[in-house]
Amino acid sequence: MERASLIQKAKLAEQAERYEDMAAFMKSAVEKGEELSCEERNLLSVAYKNVVGGQRAAWRVLSSIEQKSNEESSEEKGPEVQEYREKVETELRGVCDTVLGLLDTHLIKEAGDAESRVFYLKMKGDYYRYLAEVATGDDKKRIIDSARSAYQEAMDISKKEMPPTNPIRLGLALNFSVFHYEIANSPEEAISLAKTTFDEAMADLHTLSEDSYKDSTLIMQLLRDNLTLWTADNAGEEGGEAPEEPQS
């Protein structure tokens, strides 16, 4: 199928909310070997984020049920819940491995500018983070190290090449701070990164273009929400789950 046709079908699949189809079309487009435009890389991101988002949500629900059934020593629920949770986990790993393969084989190598490179390295960090959510033991440690390395490389480039209000730089810092808090168990680092990012963006807000204003201020609000949540958690109050960067 022609590349232009694949992109068009991905857009149709998005409108029809058929995200697995959308992901398959975008995977085929990436494998054609051409650099993606800004619009095309967003299509790729939206497709896979929706596919993996459903799997992550299902895995959390099933893990919670499994934990409760283990605590209650319920033989009726136990094996079936574990079996189903493992099935979802296998599917989730498969999607993450597919995305990471596309990033390493095509997208990061073909990135022609700093913004694209940061976008894809952030994506690499995100999909290793999703793998870390379901990993255990030595495997988990290796995956966490891979996520941290991708996020850090993206941060280093973004600080040199992009203004503090750039929505891709802000989204990267948001997700890296969530990684520190929820995966790496480093709340101080999470709070420090979120606060520094928010403060630097606030100081630079007057330079924002109209095009970026909505995206940037939305991510800044999420950074502030997380700071409120995490500082309450650190003070011993009950918190909740931290929001990540939304899909545009």
From Swiss-Prot:
CDD domains for the chain: 14-3-3_sigma
Annotated SMART domains: 14_3_3 (SM00101)
Any Pfam family hit: 14-3-3
Cell compartment(s), UniProt: Cytoplasm; Nucleus; Secreted
Site feature (Interaction with phosphoserine on interacting protein) residues: R56, R129
UniProt GO BP: cAMP/PKA signal transduction; establishment of skin barrier; intrinsic apoptotic signaling pathway in response to DNA damage; keratinization; keratinocyte development; keratinocyte proliferation; negative regulation of innate immune response; negative regulation of keratinocyte proliferation
Post-translational modification: Ubiquitinated. Ubiquitination by RFFL induces proteasomal degradation and indirectly regulates p53/TP53 activation.
Keyword set includes Nucleus: yes
Phosphoserine: residues bearing it: S5, S74, S248
GO molecular function: identical protein binding; phosphoserine residue binding; protein kinase binding; protein sequestering activity
Cellular component terms (Gene Ontology): cytoplasm; cytosol; extracellular region; nucleus
Chain's role: Adapter protein implicated in the regulation of a large spectrum of both general and specialized signaling pathways. Binds to a large number of partners, usually by recognition of a phosphoserine or phosphothreonine motif. Binding generally results in the modulation of the activity of the binding partner. Promotes cytosolic retention of GBP1 GTPase by binding to phosphorylated GBP1, thereby inhibiting the innate immune response. Also acts as a TP53/p53-regulated inhibitor of G2/M progression.
Assembly and oligomerization: Homodimer. Interacts with KRT17 and SAMSN1. Found in a complex with XPO7, EIF4A1, ARHGAP1, VPS26A, VPS29 and VPS35. Interacts with GAB2. Interacts with SRPK2. Interacts with COPS6. Interacts with COP1; this interaction leads to proteasomal degradation. Interacts with the 'Thr-369' phosphorylated form of DAPK2. Interacts with PI4KB. Interacts with SLITRK1. Interacts with LRRK2; this interaction is dependent on LRRK2 phosphorylation.
Further comment found in the protein's record: 14-3-3 proteins have been shown to be PKC activators, but this effect could be non-specific and only due to the acidic nature of the protein.
Protein family per UniProt: Belongs to the 14-3-3 family.
UniProt name for this protein: 14-3-3 protein sigma
Origin species: Bos taurus
